[in-house]
């Protein structure tokens, strides 16, 4: 694989990584059903993948040219991708722990896992990622080693900017790989095994002796489907990143072995960066709520198609209604709860002059036109304030489904 082919493939990966993960963040932003603690970590993971496309891949392309630079400037370019890798690892680990709590102790989940705690954990994960990834900047590097070839080529105080020339391999193998990649991956493997074993045990218990107050079988199956989807993401992360780390281990432990050829290194680097592209496809394939929201975004904002109002659906573009009593009607517009009032008014028990009124009765309209009807955003309330989704539907309202309902099998 030549350097020009490598650069073209890397640029294609960068574009796909940016577009796909922006779509993930956009979906969570506009769809209140996706705004939950687990998806906070998903957004953090998507942010790291966006940064791979925007920064890490251009840095990797620049380093591949072997340009002359100050050693610490080159070192920053080389280490930045390690920061993003570490952030992805921590986000995946946080998601695994979140799903473990949801399945093992579901009754305590809402008390233990809150939005504020999740945001705090995400902030800590990013701080740790920068500390771990930029450790070579603090002195664990090859900048102090004199390289006569670099001095002749680039001049005094400058080096040929190549990854292995500035980042020591003992840091990459012992510190980066063994401590902060392999160990978290093994921990995630153990967590997901515990999740599936616990779910299997609970399903068998439900079949033999169902207990009052337990979750229904369908709810638990949705949780298991969610865990499988996220376990696939962890598996793909390992599949994409382990080849590059294995090559580093051979380079470090077998000094007499022939160095990996350039085409193999290019292939391993491309595979590692391609991990930033795959996650949105997994969400779209495995998670119904993400898939529907992706379609809605593409149709509405890319293809510029307006979706007509569908009863029971999650989209509405127009509403014509008239009655004699003022009453709120709740709808959802592109995933957002909405209140519909005549003339932009608050609820009113009496007949409205110069416009329509909405209510349970079937009366006619007074003066005015359908243009007087407008949609006002209504504050979304958490599930604790509502008695249940069935009650909402019975009252003509739309509630927020549980997180696991996003992962209902297609």
Swiss-Prot record:
Residues 322-410 are annotated as: Interaction with GAS2L2. Keywords: Cell membrane, Disulfide bond, G-protein coupled receptor, Glycoprotein, Membrane, Receptor, Transducer, Transmembrane, Transmembrane helix, Ubl conjugation. Residues 30-39, 98-117, 194-229, 286-410 are cytoplasmic. Residues 1-4, 64-74, 141-168, 254-261 are extracellular. Glycans are attached at residues 142, 149. Adenosine binds at residues 164, 248, 272-273. Its main location: membrane. Ubiquitinated. Deubiquitinated by USP4; leading to stabilization and expression at the cell surface. It is a multi-pass membrane protein. InterPro entries: Adeno_A2A_rcpt, Adenosn_rcpt, GPCR_Rhodpsn, GPCR_Rhodpsn_7TM. It comes from the Eukaryota. One of its GO terms (molecular function) is protein-containing complex binding. GO terms for cellular component: asymmetric synapse; axolemma; dendrite; glutamatergic synapse; intermediate filament; membrane; neuronal cell body; plasma membrane. The chain crosses the membrane at residues 5-29, 40-63, 75-97, 118-140, 169-193, 230-253, 262-285. The keyword Amino-acid biosynthesis does not apply. Interacts (via cytoplasmic C-terminal domain) with USP4; the interaction is direct. May interact with DRD4. Interacts with NECAB2. Interacts (via cytoplasmic C-terminal domain) with GAS2L2; interaction enhances receptor-mediated adenylyl cyclase activity. Belongs to the G-protein coupled receptor 1 family. Receptor for adenosine. The activity of this receptor is mediated by G proteins which activate adenylyl cyclase. This is Adenosine receptor A2a.
């Amino acid at each position: 694989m030549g350097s020009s082919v490598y650069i073209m493939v890397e640029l294609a990966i960068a574009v796909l990584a940016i577009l796909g993960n922006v779509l993930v963040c956009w979906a969570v932003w506009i769809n209140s059903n996706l705004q939950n603690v687990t998806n906070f970590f998903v957004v953090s993971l998507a942010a790291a993948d966006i940064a791979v496309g925007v920064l890490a891949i251009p840095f990797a392309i620049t380093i591949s040219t072997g340009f002359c630079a100050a050693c610490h400037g080159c070192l920053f370019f080389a280490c930045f991708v390690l920061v993003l890798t570490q952030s992805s690892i921590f986000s995946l680990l946080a998601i695994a722990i979140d799903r473990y709590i949801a399945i093992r102790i579901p009754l305590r989940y809402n008390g233990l896992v809150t939005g504020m705690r999740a945001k705090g954990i995400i902030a800590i994960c990013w701080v740790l990622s920068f500390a771990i990834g930029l450790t070579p900047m603090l002195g664990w590097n090859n900048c102090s080693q004199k390289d006569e070839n670099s001095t002749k080529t680039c001049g005094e105080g400058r080096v040929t900017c190549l990854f292995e020339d500035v980042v020591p391999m003992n840091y990459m193998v012992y510190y980066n790989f063994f401590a902060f990649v392999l160990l978290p991956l093994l921990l995630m493997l153990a967590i997901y095994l515990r999740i599936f074993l616990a779910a299997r045990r609970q399903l068998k218990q439900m079949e033999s002796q169902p207990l009052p107050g337990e979750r229904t079988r369908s709810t638990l199956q949705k949780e298991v489907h969610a865990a499988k989807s996220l376990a696939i993401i962890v598996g793909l992360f390992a599949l994409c990143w382990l080849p590059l780390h294995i090559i580093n281990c051979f380079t470090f432990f077998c000094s007499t072995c022939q160095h990996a050829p350039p085409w193999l290194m290019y292939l391993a680097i491309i595979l590692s960066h391609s991990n930033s592209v795959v996650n949105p496809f997994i969400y779209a394939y495995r998670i119904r709520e993400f898939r529907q929201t992706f379609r809605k975004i593409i149709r509405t904002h890319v293809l510029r198609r307006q979706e007509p109002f569908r009863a029971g659906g999650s989209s509405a573009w127009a509403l014509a209604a008239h009655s004699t009593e003022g009453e709120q009607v709740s709808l959802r517009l592109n995933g957002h709860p909405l209140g519909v009032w005549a003339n932009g008014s608050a609820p009113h028990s009496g007949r409205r002059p110069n416009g329509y009124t909405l209510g349970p009765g079937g009366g006619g309209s007074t003066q005015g036109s359908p243009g007087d009807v407008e949609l006002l955003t209504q504050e979304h309330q958490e599930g604790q304030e509502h008695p249940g989704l069935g009650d909402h539907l019975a009252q003509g309202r739309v509630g927020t489904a549980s997180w696991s309902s996003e992962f209902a099998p297609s």
